[in-house]
Amino acid sequence: MNNTLSKRLCLTAMLTLAAVVYTTSAFAETSKLVIESGDSAQSRQEAAMEKEQWNDTRSLRQKVNTRAEKEWDKADAAFDNRDKCEQSANINAYWEPNTLRCLDRRTGRVITP
């Protein structure tokens, strides 16, 4: 009986020791903290690459913005022309929505109201 009791105590002690060692090793791994100034060669290189990419796409962004501006200006001008055409004193003038022009009913030619 003494033999089994000593085996149990030994086994319990070994399990406790293993648990303590495992727990402390886990804490040791998670408690590492590395503080960098953020001014490493790698971060400078990444920043330079990002800036270069931003500059490369700049002309594309400008083209997209210019195109959007042109489309808006065209729609705005067409809206104004439609209003002028519909309010025109010329009874033969009508607005053609497909071509966005004011046309003469008799001749089909463009009219400037």
From Swiss-Prot:
Keywords (A to Z) from UniProt: Signal
Listed Pfam families: DUF1283
Classification via InterPro entries: DUF1283 (IPR009700)
Cleaved signal peptide residues: 1-28
Family stated for the protein in its record: Belongs to the UPF0482 family.
NCBIfam families recorded: PRK13659.1
Protein name: UPF0482 protein YnfB
Organism: Salmonella typhimurium (strain LT2 / SGSC1412 / ATCC 700720)
Gene this protein is translated from: ynfB
